[in-house]
Amino acid sequence: VAPAEMGWGTHERWMPANAHVHADDGPCNQICLAQPGMETWVRSWVPSGEILGMIIRHGESYTMSNHLTVRDESGKAIYRPTVHYSYCPSNEAINSVLELRMRNWERQPEQRIMNNEIISGRDELGVLLLGHDYTGWWTGTRLSIDEARSIVDGQSATTLQVAGSVIAAFKWMVASPNEGVCVPDDLPWKSVLADARPYIGEIHSAPTDWDPLKTRNDLFPGFGNTSRLDLTDPWQFKNFLSPTPS
């Protein structure tokens, strides 16, 4: 239920009406929306195909957009990409979220973590880089439930990918006790990835020609909010939002 937060690109021509800009302290590279992340849906793509995902706030949306910011001599940001999460959970999790909304955000009295009930499926966890000469490029890991159980019995693909990263980070912390506070982007990726490698499944890196306008199928063309789309630049944030902003 936390607000949707994202790194905000310098190329954006439009901003949601309920957006709040960080303009006082720090790098001022983010915006947040006055609505829950789980109710902020965006179009995205993974190797299995196009998805709709939630903008669940995550630290890397801040740190990656900050690291990729280019500033002029006066300190003004002249280049920054928009960076946000697009998280598509399982059908059961989406149904649970719907129940939570119907309960007016009062948490269900009973919770459970699905594990042994999972009979099939795969986690596809990666980064989708968009707007360059290749149009899009997805790089990340893919781990099925069967592969996860063959690595560590009784675990799911989600928990194993997270645990592998935590193990790798702890190994780096033990070996680097004087480095102070660091974010994931600061760590030596080659050694961290090598330590996490046994737990994260197949590494996949390949181009895609997907963009948020290419596959749209508007059921009521000429009506509604389709006129709000920016057909001159597919990489505008409004083109990713679902439904299209009014």
Regions found by a protein language model. Give the residues of each.
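C-terminal catalytic/substrate-binding lobe primarily of soluble NAD(P)-dependent oxidoreductases
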Residues: 1-246
